[in-house]
Amino acid sequence: MTLDEVLAYIHKVDWRGSVPGLSRIDTLLGLLGHPERHVKYVHVTGTNGKGSTCAMLASVLRAAGYKTGLYTSPYIFRFNERMQINGAPIPDDTLCALVEELRPLADRMADPPTEFELVTAIGLTWFAREACDIVVCEVGMGGEFDATNVIPAPEAAVLTNIGLDHTKVLGNTVEAIAATKAGIIKPDCHAVLYPCAPSVQEVVAVRCRAAGAPLTVADFDALSSVCDTLEGQIFNYGPYKDLRMPLLGGHQLRNAAVALTTIDVLRQRGWHIDESAVRQGLAQTAWPGRFQVVRRQPTIILDGGHNPQCMVSLAAAIREYLPGQPVTVLTGVLADKDYGKMYDQLAPLAARFITVTPHNPRALDAGELAAFLRRYGKPVTACDTIREGVSRMLADTPPDGTAVCCGSLYLLGNVVQSLEKV
């Protein structure tokens, strides 16, 4: 199979969407001899910040000398980004060979796997065959019934910031969502939690007690900023002083605190991670599309924020780094998101909106989004293509101005490709 054939098979239209449950992926991995059982893991869930936290953890573990796998979703530029070892995406020929091996197994299953389950099986098989020392594994959605939860008890089960998202599947209260996400906590693991409301923390604590798993909550009182510019951040966390990190925004400092708390937990469990690895790993963390400056004159920032909590963080970052500047907002969103509350956060900072349709079946049409955004009294232009939207954004933004591209991770790769062509 060629790479195009492999990707067409993975994304083929007759795969079902998200179907919670572990039976299908467990069956598929069983046909392969359960490779996932031969690897150590850090399992990360949460509503926001889980990808950034995964990237920090993987970078630190790699700097400590461990052969480190990283499994995340979605991708921004190429599908292969979703599974990496020591920062390198899965090679095309390896991906093709694995799909050729898994395809007949998946096709003959009476209850075939979903796309996410198939991709997860590919990643877990690759990590095991490459003899990774440890894999940082991001949950796709939820936790307890997510395909990634087929893995054995992880070294650490990490819960980042929890909020309302995917409510039709996970529940319509933060406590209900937390209960689902806490399903990744198993006996013989150590849980790490982003500080949250007492009612939410108690939900996680109940799960920990049932599993006999210790719980450590990150200490944001021990976190302080030293220097913060568009070039990066310097901060302190507990005994760590003057740590450097390229990821921007106060929310990333909080994600870093969760990552550092997890590193301390791993040390307690026998992993050798010295301070120099922590410093090097954080400084080298790369995670595109999170308040990422990709061009100057004008300043163009990419942010994959796709729910109200994300937009609170994005708005705070704009106020911090670009105080008083009028901002051109190029945006597109998925129709099932709470985009009203999202744009309530962003509208006061926008000089104008340019709407596009992300390349995703769940996307809201650019014209519909434009009609909605006109309620904020700002100029709004709907564009037929992302490339047209990028051209309009550049035309409408002065050289000393700023444009922010946001609303969906599914938008950003096409924005970058368009920027390279205009």
Predicted stretch roles:
Residues 1-48, 52-67, 76-77, 190-199, ...:
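N-terminal leader/targeting and accessory segments in enzymes
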Residues 18, 22, 26-37, 63-152, ...:
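ATP-dependent carboxylate-amine ligase catalytic core
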Residues 38, 134-137, 145-158, 162-166, ...:
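Nucleotide phosphate-binding/pyrophosphate-handling subdomain across enzymes
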Residues 57-62, 127, 266, 346, ...:
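Hydrophobic alpha-helical packing residues
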Residues 71, 194-195, 207-229, 246-250, ...:
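Beta-strand->loop->alpha-helix junctions that form or flank phosphate-binding loops
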Residues 110, 118, 131-138, 154-242, ...:
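Acidic, Mg2+-coordinating active-site environments of NTP-dependent enzymes
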Residues 194-207, 211-216, 230-234, 299-302, ...:
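C-terminal helical cap/extension that packs against the catalytic core
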Residues 408:
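Active-site-proximal loop/hinge segments that shape catalytic or ion-binding/gating pockets
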